């Protein structure tokens, strides 16, 4: 920096390799389901339930997504990616009359709660110009008419291929697209107010497993989360009243969660009303996955007129985020300060002998009748009691291992750009050791013992992106 001038601000660039591995990143959840409005197959980061309501329309009887998001924030969650999926939902249609035709616009986001209106004017356009026009688009809140979003496009033309063609310009709009051929002449100016849809949007049909799963090639359904760098918890709320995701959706979600290093939360089927039904259901299903958390029973709301049992997958996701923030993923959920909502009670009483049988099958138990003391007990994954993945039958062990592997993965990606393999190995080993020391000091390991080994050698060749660097970790959670 020149001695002649010092603005009092010094900017220093710090390479990723100089940054410590983050041991305290906020746990992030992802929910996939049906909503009243909002972008389709696009992960949207939501930090409050009010924000969810503004973007996706809030709670809705046709979907459990809104209730799950509300549970999530009520129980300590702070950030969740929401992916809206739909089954043949349609956007509202607006028609702008023109001298010899009509300009048809279709709302980008489908749904009955997506209210779009439009106005046409010729302000700032010479009187002898009969081609240019201005377009004002607004998204308004249902009922109140409050303007939520507004887009203004000036000096548009109808003729395709020309500069400022309405068809080309509206490709960038987040509200509408041009549908069908455009008229030869510009649309007529709106006399007063705005033009409302001639055809309202629709919410489509109930979701199928294929809507939830989506397409890897198209980035739809759960694969829309490929746009997100990292998720810790994945949850598919029941797609409709009295339903849970089917086998195809569960299998796809299991595989996706495993690939992303995330934990999948599964709600129990509503048909499970007794302990023996849950045990039989688990054995018949044959689920054995260390990356899946499930529970039994569902809950009921104290003093509510509702007679049905509710899923609490959203609440459990929130509790996991709260647990990680306050204690760490190596701790159990069954402890003070991590109870379910005071109004939630187990749908059925679970005796201690039955609880043992449920845990043996890999189901965590919702237990406790005292207000404010309904807990998630068991700390098991669906690998419990099986030969496959039995080392990760413990929920705390599996979550700690996922946290360690994900943090190291994110914190060492710079190594592929290293030209000196020996230096990269040494730096990685040092950083990982420091990271494990932080976890050890926080109480993550029994007896504070752990081992870090990074493959050694004096090779000066660049790191092979295909082979990578071998890192061996040993610890006792």
Task: Please describe what each predicted stretch is.
Residues 1-111, 126-128, 138-143, 220-477:
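Structured, hydrophobic secondary-structure cores that serve as assembly/anchoring elements
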Residues 184-213:
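Long, low-complexity, polar/charged, intrinsically disordered or flexibly structured peripheral segments
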Residues 100-176:
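Extended, Lys/Arg-rich, non-catalytic nucleic-acid recognition/anchoring regions
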Residues 175, 180, 185-189, 400-404:
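Charged, gly/pro-rich, cysteine-poor intrinsically disordered low-complexity regions
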Residues 12, 177-179, 183, 193-196, ...:
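Generic N-terminal simple sequence motifs
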Residues 214-219:
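Phosphate-interacting basic helix/loop segments used at nucleotide- and nucleic-acid interfaces
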């Amino acid at each position: 920096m020149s001695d002649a001038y010092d603005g009092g601000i010094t900017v220093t660039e710090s390479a990723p390799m100089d940054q410590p591995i983050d041991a305290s990143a906020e746990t992030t959840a992802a929910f996939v389901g049906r909503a009243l409005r909002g972008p389709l197959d696009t992960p949207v980061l939501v930090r409050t339930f009010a924000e969810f309501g503004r973007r996706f329309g809030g709670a809705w009887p046709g979907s459990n997504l809104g209730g799950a998001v509300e549970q999530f924030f009520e129980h300590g969650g702070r950030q969740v990616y929401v992916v809206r999926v739909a089954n043949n939902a349609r956007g509202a249609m607006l028609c702008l009359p023109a001298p010899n035709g009509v300009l048809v616009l279709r709302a980008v986001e489908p749904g009955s709660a997506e209210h779009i209106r439009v106005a046409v004017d010729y302000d700032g356009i010479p009187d002898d110009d009969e081609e240019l026009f201005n377009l004002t688009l607004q998204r308004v809140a249902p009922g109140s008419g409050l303007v939520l979003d507004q887009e203004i496009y000036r000096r548009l033309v109808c003729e395709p291929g020309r500069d400022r063609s309405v068809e080309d310009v509206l490709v960038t709009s987040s509200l509408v697209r041009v549908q069908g051929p455009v008229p030869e002449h510009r649309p007529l100016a709106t006399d007063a107010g705005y033009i409302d849809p001639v055809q309202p949007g629709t919410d489509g049909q109930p979701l199928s497993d294929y809507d939830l799963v989506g397409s890897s090639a198209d980035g739809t359904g759960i694969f829309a989360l490929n746009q997100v760098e990292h998720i810790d918890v994945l949850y598919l709320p029941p797609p409709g009243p009295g339903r849970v995701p089917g086998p195809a959706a569960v299998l796809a979600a299991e595989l996706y969660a495993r690939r992303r290093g995330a934990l999948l939360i599964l709600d129990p089927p509503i048909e499970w009303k007794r302990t023996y039904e849950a045990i039989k259901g688990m054995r018949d299903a044959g689920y054995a996955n260390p990356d899946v958390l499930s529970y039994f029973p569902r809950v009921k709301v104290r003093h509510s007129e509702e007679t049905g049992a509710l899923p609490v997958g959203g609440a459990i996701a929130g509790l996991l985020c709260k647990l990680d923030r306050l204690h760490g993923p190596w701790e159990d959920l069954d402890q003070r300060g991590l109870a379910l909502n005071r109004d939630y009670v187990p749908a059925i009483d679970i005796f201690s002998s039955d609880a043992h049988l449920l845990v043996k099958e890999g189901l965590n138990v919702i237990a406790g009748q005292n207000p404010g003391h309904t807990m998630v007990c068991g700390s098991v994954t669906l690998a419990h009691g099986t030969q496959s993945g039995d080392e990760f039958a413990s929920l705390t062990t599996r979550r700690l291992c996922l946290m360690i592997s994900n943090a190291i993965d994110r914190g060492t990606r710079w190594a592929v750009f290293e030209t000196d393999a020996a230096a990269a190995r040494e730096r990685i080993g040092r950083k990982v050791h420091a990271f494990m020391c932080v976890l050890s000091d926080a109480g993550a390991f029994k007896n504070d013992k752990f081992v870090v080994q990074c493959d050694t050698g004096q090779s000066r060749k660049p790191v092979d992106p295909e082979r990578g660097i071998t890192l061996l970790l040993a610890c006792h959670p």
